[in-house]
Amino acid sequence: MNIQLICETENSQNFTALCKEKGLTHDPASVLALVQTETDGEVRLELRKLDEPKLGAVYVDFVAGTMAHRRKFGGGRGEAIAKAVGVKGNELPSVIDATAGLGRDAFVLASIGCRVRLVERHPVVYLLLQDGLRRAYADPEIGEMMQKNMQLLPVHHITELNPFEDFADVVYLDPMYPHKQKSALVKKEMRVFQYLVGADSDSNLLLEPALKLAKKRVVVKRPDYAEFLAEKAPQFSRETKNHRFDIYSVNV
């Protein structure tokens, strides 16, 4: 993939090696840039849309900001995603998040106590997520929990996983879906992210391998206006204000 690769820190060797490993090539004409920068003494990776600097940078931060607030003051076990994957009482299902993205839904589940393995196929998003996890693992408050409950797998698609060895209670899918125009502008950060990733044109191909990996259920997060994934009706759905969780039970 071609993208601008910019290093604003003194040590560029690690950044160069990471980009090479993921097949990223510097393209000075690209409006997107993956940047290694340093803020308050901490090195991190950011995604920037250079022609729209007001949109700000996209980076993964599980330690502070929105995610820290959600961990401390969010709904916890009462959150819709927790109910959708089957968190109940002492039951904390193991989860494969097969479309990990920036890791936010996985973080909610990990904070509750679920063990979540993440799969992300886009090389830039993979590096952003890997970088966010690296910093979270080193945090004195949540580092131990994160190392135990959130693991980024060295694969890029769930078809690379072996159903006889790499199964989980739940496989979670949240494929990118074309947003309605008014909702696409709600979060500036999402505009940058969607410009990079676009819609998952082959997302319908995720359901069958997900069903093979799941021991109990597959949970698919969809906008409330979206059709069922792969045009396959779920056993039931949980609805929220703007989304729904379609739930496909295994062995029913």
From Swiss-Prot:
Q: What is its EC number?
A: 2.1.1.242
Q: Quote one Gene Ontology molecular function term.
A: rRNA (guanine-N2-)-methyltransferase activity
InterPro entries in the record, alphabetically?
Answer: 16SrRNA_methylTrfase_J, SAM-dependent_MTases_sf
As its record notes, the protein acts as a catalyst of: guanosine(1516) in 16S rRNA + S-adenosyl-L-methionine = N(2)-methylguanosine(1516) in 16S rRNA + S-adenosyl-L-homocysteine + H(+)
Q: Which amino acid positions bind S-adenosyl-L-methionine, per UniProt?
A: 104-105, 120-121, 174
- What enzyme category does the UniProt record give? transferase
Domain of life per record: Bacteria
What subcellular locations does the record give? Cytoplasm
Q: Which GO terms describe its cellular component?
A: cytoplasm
UniProt entry keywords in alphabetical sequence: Cytoplasm, Methyltransferase, rRNA processing, S-adenosyl-L-methionine, Transferase
Task: Please verify whether the record's keywords include Methyltransferase.
Answer: yes
Q: Which Gene3D superfamilies does this chain map to? A: Vaccinia Virus protein VP39, YhiQ-like domain
Q: Do you know which Pfam families this protein is assigned to?
A: SAM_MT
Q: Which family does it belong to?
A: Belongs to the methyltransferase superfamily. RsmJ family.
Function of this protein? Answer: Specifically methylates the guanosine in position 1516 of 16S rRNA.
The protein depicted here goes by the name: Ribosomal RNA small subunit methyltransferase J
Species whose genome carries this gene: Mannheimia succiniciproducens (strain KCTC 0769BP / MBEL55E)
Q: What is the lineage of its organism?
A: Bacteria, Pseudomonadati, Pseudomonadota, Gammaproteobacteria, Pasteurellales
